[in-house]
């Protein structure tokens, strides 16, 4: 176990436990003054995973006795955010501290900070949005969901004033999922459904008197808030939709009977995107039960029950046609393209990585002593992918089959220098 590996293990342990501190009771060992940050974000407390990397490491150092006790007694901690991962990690650090030479086998995960928005920011060179998703270096990691929540509150102040929801509950129940999925073109209806479900899971429906109608209202305003916070990325999504329109819905595309959108990702993966109109059909069938000793029981509309000799089945199915479904192309091009770029980034990283590697969606994992090396490679490949003066031209070359058929003006580029990500602690963390 190297010193760098031990540091990364300590950071991981701190995030697995993830203790929360009130702004009025911040510990003395902190190396950073979080009060201005908490005031600006309108938060009353801070969890360890929102602190600097130095303070995450310091948390483990200052709680080592408690952590070693968890290891000695093999405790599944009820107060830890990730109790199983915590136990595995403290068993690891116990052996590492006690043995002069120690080989670690535990995978240490590093997670992307809003990957979809990261790619959209890089395409549009949106520096302001890049500051919120870990592309631009920050002393303290900014919270993208809080920024969206703050703008949302300004749009419907009376609603939030009436309920007196603390920011951390607004972030978790109202803003988080919608802000995350909007990068993949989630609409107001889906955002409202997810918002209602999240509030139900967290117990906010009764606590703050939140209805489905409230979520429908908030979802519409949340989309406007996201548009304000992430202007560049949202324009990029609209640009991709215009390309889809030209490729599938234009007179030119209809004349040549174009039925798919195709591109090749930076990793060399060929994408064929298809979506077809489906015709609905119905089939009816009757199953005879006359020879069964125990007859099926049917419940009538009035609630009464009776035995039956037959069961009637009605199946509704869908069969695809060869007609392109324009609406699906329009709504799906942005998430499919962004996901393909995200997958391409991971593929390029894996292709150059010469060691053990694990991945779950946007979470990469390697052994503790290799984390810093992996982070360098992740940043290097991201920079390489987006080191173009105008990535909108790259997108057109990737997707547009006939430049004469596409005359939509490209969105205005921001001032982001993609090389800034090299010095960011929170691009993946």
Descriptions of predicted regions:
Residues 1-429:
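Conserved catalytic core of nucleotide polymerization and phosphodiester-bond processing enzymes
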């Amino acid at each position: 176990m190297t010193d760098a590996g031990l540091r990364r293990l300590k950071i991981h342990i701190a995030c697995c436990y993830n203790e929360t501190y009130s702004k009025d009771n911040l510990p003395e060992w902190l190396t950073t003054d979080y009060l201005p940050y908490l005031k600006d974000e309108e938060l009353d407390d801070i969890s360890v995973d929102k602190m600097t990397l130095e303070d995450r490491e310091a948390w483990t150092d200052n709680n080592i006795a408690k952590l070693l006790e968890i290891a000695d007694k093999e405790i599944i901690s009820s107060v830890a955010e990730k109790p199983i991962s915590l136990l595995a990690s403290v068993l690891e650090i116990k052996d590492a501290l006690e043995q002069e030479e120690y080989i670690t086998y535990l995978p240490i995960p590093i997670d992307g900070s809003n990957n979809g928005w990261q790619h959209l920011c890089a395409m549009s060179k949106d520096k302001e949005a890049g500051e919120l998703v870990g592309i631009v270096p920050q002393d303290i990691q900014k919270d993208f969901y809080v920024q969206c929540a703050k703008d949302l509150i300004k749009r419907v102040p009376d609603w939030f004033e009436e309920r007196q929801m603390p920011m951390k509950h607004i972030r978790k129940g109202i803003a988080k999922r919608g802000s995350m999925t909007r990068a993949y073109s989630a609409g107001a209806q889906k955002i409202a459904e997810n918002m209602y479900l999240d509030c139900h899971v967290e117990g906010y429906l009764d606590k703050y008197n939140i209805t489905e109608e409230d979520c429908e209202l908030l979802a519409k305003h949340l989309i406007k808030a996201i548009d304000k916070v992430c202007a560049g990325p949202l324009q990029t999504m609209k640009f991709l939709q215009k390309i889809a329109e030209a490729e599938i819905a234009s007179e030119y595309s209809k004349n040549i009977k174009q039925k798919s959108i195709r591109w090749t990702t930076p990793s060399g993966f060929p994408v064929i995107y298809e979506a077809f109109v489906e015709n609905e059909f119905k089939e009816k069938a009757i199953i005879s039960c006359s020879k069964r000793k125990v007859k099926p029981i049917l419940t009538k509309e009035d609630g009464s029950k009776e035995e039956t000799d037959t069961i009637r089945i009605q199946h509704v199915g869908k069969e695809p046609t060869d007609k392109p479904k324009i609406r699906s192309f329009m709504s799906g091009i942005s998430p499919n393209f962004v996901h393909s770029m995200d997958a391409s980034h991971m593929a390029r990283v894996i292709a150059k990585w010469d060691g053990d590697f694990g991945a779950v969606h946007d979470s990469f994992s390697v052994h503790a002593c290799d984390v810093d090396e992996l982070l360098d490679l992740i940043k290097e490949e991201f920079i390489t992918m987006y080191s173009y003066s105008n990535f909108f031209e790259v997108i057109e070359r990737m997707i547009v089959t006939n430049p004469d058929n596409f005359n939509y003006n490209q969105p205005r580029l921001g001032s982001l220098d993609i090389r800034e990500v090299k010095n960011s602690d929170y691009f993946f963390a």
